[in-house]
Amino acid sequence: MKELLYLAAFLAVTLGIAHSVLGERYILVRLFRRDDLPKLFGGTEFTTRTLRFAWHITTVAWFGFGALLLHAGRGDLTPSGTLRIIGFTFILSGLLPLVITRGKHLSWLVLFAIGGIALWGAA
């Protein structure tokens, strides 16, 4: 079973990388060329930045799942360790809207709060 969990972890990370790279190259770029994107806050920049972080946040989540699967395969997945992985996954998820939308999409506040609470629970 250990090897299958390692394989699942590898597949989760690989899928995340493929999702971000291929999605950026073949979906997002083409989508952003459209003339009919919603104009929020005076233009389409907020819309494109929000769509970009929303796309890539899936990859961060899959990396977090990959870490959980890896630790499950190693047999050292504890409640505290699980909370640490969840906490760091949410902190990394919060960095996406903070950086990509320059803080305009306020989800980063909630994502950081969730991550902080999870890390606090792990301590």
Regions found by a protein language model. Name each.
Residues E3-R25:
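N-terminal signal-anchor transmembrane alpha helix
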Residues A12-H19, W62-L69, F90-P97, G115-G121:
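Helical transmembrane-bundle signal
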Residues E3, I17, V29-R33, A72, ...:
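Polytopic alpha-helical membrane-helix bundles and their juxtamembrane interface segments
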Residues A9, I86, W108-G115:
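Hydrophobic core segments of alpha-helical transmembrane domains in multi-pass membrane proteins
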Residues F41-I85:
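Alpha-helical transmembrane segments and their cytosolic membrane-interface
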